[in-house]
């Protein structure tokens, strides 16, 4: 059972898939420590704007389960936080090249704390968010750091910037 962003209660995967929109390709999920923390993540706002249901993974094993299962009833799992949401026309084109100088400056200023700086396709009202792309997620990194720190598994740190946000527009001016 997983907490549903739209139903506001625990639901099964079968219930989630049964409610999916006809054109929805993925089972969207977001991982975090608490339902409240996940509910306030900036990375989920585009899915919420499109009235997409998000499963909230609060148990350390949940993300591993999605990674092992890969699909449920022919619907792949997709992280709302770390992957491309593939919402078609809802996403603006990659503007990283247009803002290359600003992004290079931000990355250089942050030193080794981020691997990449790019224009966000997820943010609407928030100025920035941190994502990990595909592969090791932040929740997996926390888990492995706690149980097997010698592995040194690290999530890739991608700083996504809302290029339409007043804070970025003021920075760029």
Feature map (PLM): residue ranges:
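Conserved GHKL (Bergerat-fold) ATPase module
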Residues: 1-173
